[in-house]
Amino acid sequence: MNQASTRFIFVTGGVVSSLGKGLAAASIGALLQARGFKICLRKLDPYLNIDPGTMSPIQHGEVFVTDDGAETDLDLGHYERFTGVKTTKNDNITTGKVYHNLLKKERRGDYLGQTVQIIPHVTDLINSFILHDTDKLDFVICEIGGTVGDIESQPFLESIRQIGYKLSKNNTIFVHLTLVPYIDAAMELKTKPTQHSVKELSSVGIQPDIILYRSKIPLSKEQRDKIANLCNVSSTNIIPALDVKNIYELPISYHNYNLDTQILNHFNIDSPEPDLRKWENILNISHAVTKTVNVAIIGKYIKLLDAYKSLIEALEHASIHNKVKLSIKWIDSRSLDSNEINIFDKVDSILIPGGFGDDGIQGKMTAITYARLNKIPFLGICMGMQLAIIEFANNVAHLEDANSTEFNLYCKNPVIHQLPELQQNFLGGSMKLGSCPCYLESGSKIFSIYQQSIIHERRRHRYAFNLQYKDLLEQHGLIFTGKSNNNNDSLIEVIELKDHPWFIGVQFHPEFKSSPFHSHPLFISFIKASLD
């Protein structure tokens, strides 16, 4: 590592979780990038899972898939969308992965009879992850998951403390995000939680250089001075992380409160002002729209909308591109039946996202049937495409008991089946993952959307269309317009309906490649069709 040129920014959080550390880290990256610096962002997650791939979306939220096939925390999606820098498997690590690698090294004899301990062996592995391949970067922004004080976070905090000591203040800065709650009854902001959070962080040897406080309103000068005195942080480095209506307001908001300026001052770096015109343009468009598009999303994880974070953002990007306001009607697939189709009366389009398991399948099928019969724009993603095939096989091709072996292993017509190479005893890491090529049929709607014959999209699935049913379904009007290669045994990646204005299913996850500045063409077309 070129210690003279690479600076490390560590972002920690206190008081409560879900304050927006990932968005703060992404905003810092975007602001430094707007000044011309080369950056990367990394995430340390303290849970014992090797990755979030087998975790419930209701507990953890979305699993974000990188180009190289890593199943990662949803914050990596924020990193990519805010900066355009593609993340990799080297940008997210968990306690589980650290221990997994540690025990493999121990079994190989790499430690030569040493007593393997948290310090130095675990912390050394964490340090290696943070420092790996950073010598050509100006800044590495590293977010530490969880909350200061959690027992799971201790090895990670010790690791960044060590890096801060070894590289000195000239090359490291600690940014701590806390909560300053507003008590309605007292009509005042309370700083005590922030004081205790900084005290907790200081107890492990880390003195924050900047405090970001999450709040509805800014603190007064007197309140900032109080925190500065009690937390040993300059009052100019106590910066608000205010609630915003649109997350893409955050970089400009942080810049207006001098966050990037104070970071550069810490490192004694002179820099031109950031070019934030693209961020201003996005906000100007989103604030000026008057027309609304209504999209119905039918899913089973809607109790935690973070389960669909990239999907929501991709629809927002496409709506901004089409200069309309997005309104999402969330429908729980487990409570939807064929007698409630009036729920779709005021929607412009229907979307079925990815998912797992048979819970709520009938509700999704009801929505697909409605979209097909009423010529409403429909987009099915991953399982959404598979269910569209099952619905078509049953109701149009009249195949008896057409289903997926994921839902019924012994169905008569398994139009969706598990890929043979993925039939393993382990669930974790046992899917087709990451960016793969997809060959599009010339003259198809999907080709007209992408305007190219070969695309690359990210996948996350272990079930696929059974090619034995291809000819039969084609005879009834289902069109297969995208495949994984040009061979006869290629996986089906895209389907369309012959007699429908806009009905597309994709096996891949296009939402992972959308950004506010490069809205995904498939979502642009979907929103446009919703307006027609």
UniProtKB/Swiss-Prot annotation:
The record's GO molecular-function terms, alphabetically, read: ATP binding; CTP synthase activity; glutaminase activity; identical protein binding; metal ion binding
First-tier enzyme category under EC: ligase
Q: What is its EC number?
A: 6.3.4.2
Q: Which residues bind ATP?
A: 18-23, 75
Q: Which residues bind UTP?
A: 17, 190-195, 226
Show the catalytic activity: UTP + L-glutamine + ATP + H2O = CTP + L-glutamate + ADP + phosphate + 2 H(+); L-glutamine + H2O = L-glutamate + NH4(+); UTP + NH4(+) + ATP = CTP + ADP + phosphate + 2 H(+)
The answer on whether this UniProt entry bears the keyword Lyase reads no
The UniProt entry, under SUPFAM superfamilies, shows: Class I glutamine amidotransferase-like, P-loop containing nucleoside triphosphate hydrolases
Q: Which residues bind L-glutamine?
A: 355, 383-386, 406, 462
Which of this chain's residues are annotated to bind CTP?
A: 17, 150-152, 190-195, 226
Pathway(s) of this molecule: Pyrimidine metabolism; CTP biosynthesis via de novo pathway; CTP from UDP: step 2/2
A single cellular component GO annotation: cytosol
Q: Which UniProt keywords apply?
A: ATP-binding, Glutamine amidotransferase, Ligase, Magnesium, Metal-binding, Nucleotide-binding, Pyrimidine biosynthesis
- Biological process GO terms, please? 'de novo' CTP biosynthetic process; pyrimidine nucleobase biosynthetic process
Residues annotated for Mg(2+) binding in this entry: 75, 143
Specify the Glutamine amidotransferase type-1 domain's residue ranges: 294-532
Print the miscellaneous field.
Answer: CTPSs have evolved a hybrid strategy for distinguishing between UTP and CTP. The overlapping regions of the product feedback inhibitory and substrate sites recognize a common feature in both compounds, the triphosphate moiety. To differentiate isosteric substrate and product pyrimidine rings, an additional pocket far from the expected kinase/ligase catalytic site, specifically recognizes the cytosine and ribose portions of the product inhibitor.
Concerning PANTHER family, the annotation shows: CTP SYNTHASE, CTP SYNTHASE-RELATED
State its role: Catalyzes the ATP-dependent amination of UTP to CTP with either L-glutamine or ammonia as the source of nitrogen. Regulates intracellular CTP levels through interactions with the four ribonucleotide triphosphates.
Indicate the quaternary assembly. Homotetramer.
Q: What is this protein called?
A: CTP synthase
